[in-house]
């Protein structure tokens, strides 16, 4: 039976919530543990569905993995399987991040083409071309990407687009390559910086992370490490928008506000009061938000993962706004569900024009991906009556204790079997 949420609108969310490790970091860090024989420990891990899925992938490759609350322990053997071509791999997008480590450790990798959120085309072209620049041959065969290399050699690589996934796979493939790799137009996301911090603690020689150019000097061997996962800026941003949309007052801990600089600035423009601290922030809103234009871009631009929240707040704002999606072409399918809730919006290519209204109307809606699901719950909190949110398994993949946290903040929400 698939679960659904019953969400009653009208509550002004108030209180404090702490975010744990980033989904977009922990899965890549787990994969990076493949690079070193021995036991690597990750702390501050989020208790979300994708972590046990990645455990299953690593176990299938020969690792021993234990999950104890927010701590994940990975013991990597001397001899790994290079074949990640089994069902667990197809269930979520991040599984492709084993491609780089397996190619580096085994000289060969077979990785099933991954699944995950239905938010547009996310081809592996840049992953493959990056590995090929390092000396590997790659091909797509029978639903899997295959990489083979007698040895990897450092190279100058320029990405067509600052892809997070391609940056990660090139990093993990090049840390033990012979010589120097210079990666230009690299992704600058905080999760990339977190991966580089972990790799450096394992003995990698990396400079420039957080900038468009990352330089890697290959080393012969990496060693296991202990590492604390960076806080989840997307979950933190979701709580920030929850405060503003419900005209509430929420304090968020466990996240450096600099990672959410632009979203918090956008909330200020919409009329929210924002206070920032060393490891958290507070968002207060006591009136209808003002319409605010957005465009999604790679970090440090506005994150595409918060685009549903930008649509949500503008749906209940004063005025007309334009949201431009520059990263994933299919992310506007979320708008169809917002229309069910009574939003006044229309899609034109990679833009959506929203005319704000005072209140949305309760109905039944369906999640299509992790962030759309969370965005629909926030929108339901701004509707009259009770809204049914279906396919909430998507939300479980990215938001730990979502219902419990909302209830603690004053929302009326329950999980039931549909």
Curated annotation (Swiss-Prot):
<dbReference type="GO" id="GO:0071555">
    <property type="term" value="P:cell wall organization"/>
</dbReference>
<dbReference type="GO" id="GO:0051301">
    <property type="term" value="P:cell division"/>
</dbReference>
<dbReference type="GO" id="GO:0008760">
    <property type="term" value="F:UDP-N-acetylglucosamine 1-carboxyvinyltransferase activity"/>
</dbReference>
<keyword id="KW-0573">Peptidoglycan synthesis</keyword>
<feature type="binding site">
    <location>
        <position position="93"/>
    </location>
    <ligand>
        <name>UDP-N-acetyl-alpha-D-glucosamine</name>
    </ligand>
</feature>
<feature type="active site" description="Proton donor">
    <location>
        <position position="117"/>
    </location>
</feature>
<keyword id="KW-0963">Cytoplasm</keyword>
<dbReference type="InterPro" id="IPR013792">
    <property type="entry name" value="RNA3'P_cycl/enolpyr_Trfase_a/b"/>
</dbReference>
<dbReference type="GO" id="GO:0008360">
    <property type="term" value="P:regulation of cell shape"/>
</dbReference>
<keyword id="KW-0132">Cell division</keyword>
<keyword id="KW-0808">Transferase</keyword>
<keyword id="KW-0133">Cell shape</keyword>
<comment type="pathway">
    <text>Cell wall biogenesis; peptidoglycan biosynthesis.</text>
</comment>
<protein>
    <recommendedName>
        <fullName>UDP-N-acetylglucosamine 1-carboxyvinyltransferase</fullName>
        <ecNumber>2.5.1.7</ecNumber>
    </recommendedName>
</protein>
<dbReference type="Pfam" id="PF00275">
    <property type="entry name" value="EPSP_synthase"/>
</dbReference>
<feature type="binding site">
    <location>
        <position position="327"/>
    </location>
    <ligand>
        <name>UDP-N-acetyl-alpha-D-glucosamine</name>
    </ligand>
</feature>
<dbReference type="GO" id="GO:0009252">
    <property type="term" value="P:peptidoglycan biosynthetic process"/>
</dbReference>
<dbReference type="GO" id="GO:0005737">
    <property type="term" value="C:cytoplasm"/>
</dbReference>
<dbReference type="InterPro" id="IPR050068">
    <property type="entry name" value="MurA_subfamily"/>
</dbReference>
<keyword id="KW-0961">Cell wall biogenesis/degradation</keyword>
<dbReference type="InterPro" id="IPR005750">
    <property type="entry name" value="UDP_GlcNAc_COvinyl_MurA"/>
</dbReference>
<comment type="function">
    <text>Cell wall formation. Adds enolpyruvyl to UDP-N-acetylglucosamine.</text>
</comment>
<keyword id="KW-0131">Cell cycle</keyword>
<dbReference type="GO" id="GO:0019277">
    <property type="term" value="P:UDP-N-acetylgalactosamine biosynthetic process"/>
</dbReference>
<dbReference type="InterPro" id="IPR001986">
    <property type="entry name" value="Enolpyruvate_Tfrase_dom"/>
</dbReference>
<comment type="similarity">
    <text>Belongs to the EPSP synthase family. MurA subfamily.</text>
</comment>
<feature type="binding site">
    <location>
        <position position="305"/>
    </location>
    <ligand>
        <name>UDP-N-acetyl-alpha-D-glucosamine</name>
    </ligand>
</feature>
<feature type="binding site">
    <location>
        <begin position="23"/>
        <end position="24"/>
    </location>
    <ligand>
        <name>phosphoenolpyruvate</name>
    </ligand>
</feature>
<dbReference type="InterPro" id="IPR036968">
    <property type="entry name" value="Enolpyruvate_Tfrase_sf"/>
</dbReference>
